Design a protein with these regions (language model features):
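A short, well-ordered alpha-helix in the C-terminal region of glycosyltransferases
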Residues: 378-391, 400-403, 407
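Short alpha-helical donor nucleotide-sugar binding micro-motif in glycosyltransferases
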Residues: 306-311
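Short acidic/histidine- and often glycine-rich active-site loop of Leloir-type glycosyltransferases
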Residues: 286, 341-356
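Aromatic "clamp/platform" in nucleotide-sugar-dependent glycosyltransferases that forms part
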Residues: 319
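Conserved acidic donor-binding segment of nucleotide-sugar-dependent glycosyltransferases
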Residues: 351, 355-362, 371-377
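Conserved donor-binding/catalytic core segment of Leloir-type glycosyltransferases
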Residues: 194, 239-257, 263-266
Length: 421
């Protein structure tokens, strides 16, 4: 009889990072003889094509009600009770061999109902932690705010109006207690928590989830897409004629991603230097100074890889991040990275693949970039690509998950792999 894998995530769309990950894990699992099922929010993604069998959860009205409970009463993850009961009934019928949680926030699940069910069955549970929401009373990142309340107990949340925004109530103190009770209810041997960075594991070891069993599995990328390219096409398309090209990429540009820092850096550029920013909105593009070329968000990954290849240095002045994929993509295209010492952003950067500077030190970031330019990109290109081939292959990271599933089903212990091995 085939083993059954059930993954749970709010989105299924491949143009979202977690949607792509759950689909590709499912596809690889099927190649290795598993039946693959994915439960997701029908209210957010509708009925979508997928090679795995899908279990749509809730509907648009359910998402809207959950959104209202979030906006008014700070009850994110505490609505959608009926939709979650229906999901539990499907899970009971399906009897999966492994349950793999991804994001359980996203306006579609009532997490106390889900975890009461998980605590009462014997099925191994894997939980990939893509952000910090699981162990805070409200926010999904706290680095930029400099908040450490999550270590001992939240309350009077400084980020109440940020995702998942609450316009009226601050329930962060009770949310913290509710999450702690639910997320520590499973026996340690049945829940394996998978942070996507060593940094996040270190943070969780200081949270109410400190006694969990952890195994870090980094995210990977498609190395057959992100590889060194000739740059003539994008150079002409975007009129990039300067001698030295610095690149920055984000899905959304905001203060937390380093927008203000890059504007300061642009004011320091020489005439033979240009900053290219990918992911800007039309409004942001109109605001850019003349020595910054703004490119709106593109789903054309081949063009994005060409832009990575064109740049001499990739800049990532992020103030909060777990394990940014943009760093991996740049390095895979042979381009060294200069990043702030932020979260897991440093984990792909070695002396051979880039440099790390302190948060907010824009002058040091530009100096590091110029040091790389002076040394020559040729010094880094091969080392970057070799490092990517060894560490960033998405299929190898997905195999790590399949190996984890098999170990759990055999009742074997989960050994944390040395991140430097």
């Amino acid at each position: 009889m085939q083993k059954r894998l059930l993954q749970i995530n709010p989105v299924l769309r491949r143009n979202t990072s977690t949607g792509r990950i759950v689909q590709e894990i499912g596809e690889l699992a099927m190649v290795h003889g598993w039946e693959s099922y994915i439960a997701y929010s029908r209210g957010r993604d509708g009925m979508m094509p997928c090679q795995s069998q899908t279990i749509p959860v809730g509907g648009k009205a359910d998402v809207a009600w959950h959104g209202l409970m979030t906006r008014l009463f700070d009850r994110h993850g505490l609505a959608s009770e009926q939709a979650t009961r229906e999901l539990v009934e499907r899970m009971e019928d399906l009897q999966p061999d492994v349950i793999h949680l991804h994001n359980i926030h996203g306006y579609f699940l009532h997490y106390p109902t889900l975890f009461r069910y998980l605590a009462g069955i014997k099925t191994p549970v894997v939980w990939t932690i893509h952000d910090c929401w699981a162990y805070t009373g409200h926010c999904y990142y706290y680095s930029f705010a400099g908040c450490q309340k999550w270590r001992t107990g939240c309350g009077k949340c400084p980020q109440r109006r940020l995702f998942p925004a609450s316009w009226w109530k601050d329930r962060s103190a009770q949310n913290f207690k509710d999450k702690a009770r639910a997320f520590t209810s499973l026996p340690k041997e049945r829940l394996t928590v998978v942070p996507v960075s060593e940094w996040m594991k270190g943070e969780m070891l200081q949270s109410f989830m400190a006694d969990s069993r952890f195994k870090v599995i980094h995210n990977g990328i498609n190395l057959s897409v992100f590889l060194p390219y000739a740059d003539d096409e994008v150079r002409y398309k975007y009129h990039i004629y300067q001698e030295h090209v610095l690149l920055a990429v984000a899905s959304i540009w905001c203060r937390e991603k380093g927008w203000d820092d890059l504007m300061r850096l642009a004011a320091m550029l020489r005439k033979n230097e240009v900053l290219v920013m990918v992911g800007v909105t039309e409004e942001q593009r109109r605001m850019l100074p003349k020595n910054v070329i703004g490119i709106c968000r593109t789903d054309n990954v081949d063009e994005l890889a060409q832009l990575y290849s064109l740049a001499e240095v990739f800049l990532n002045p992020t103030w909060q991040d777990n394990y940014p994929t943009v760093n991996l993509e740049a390095i895979a295209c042979g381009t060294p990275v200069v990043t702030y010492h932020t979260g897991g952003s440093v984990e792909a950067v070695t002396p051979h693949t880039g440099k790390v500077v302190e948060q907010g030190d824009v002058e040091a970031m530009l100096e590091a970039a110029r040091t790389i330019v002076k040394r020559g990109k040729h010094f880094y290109r091969t080392a970057c690509r070799d490092y990517a081939m060894k560490h960033f292959d998405k299929d190898e990271r997905y195999i790590d998950y399949l190996c984890l599933y098999d170990r759990l089903l055999k009742g074997k212990s989960v050994h944390q792999k040395n991140p430097d091995a």
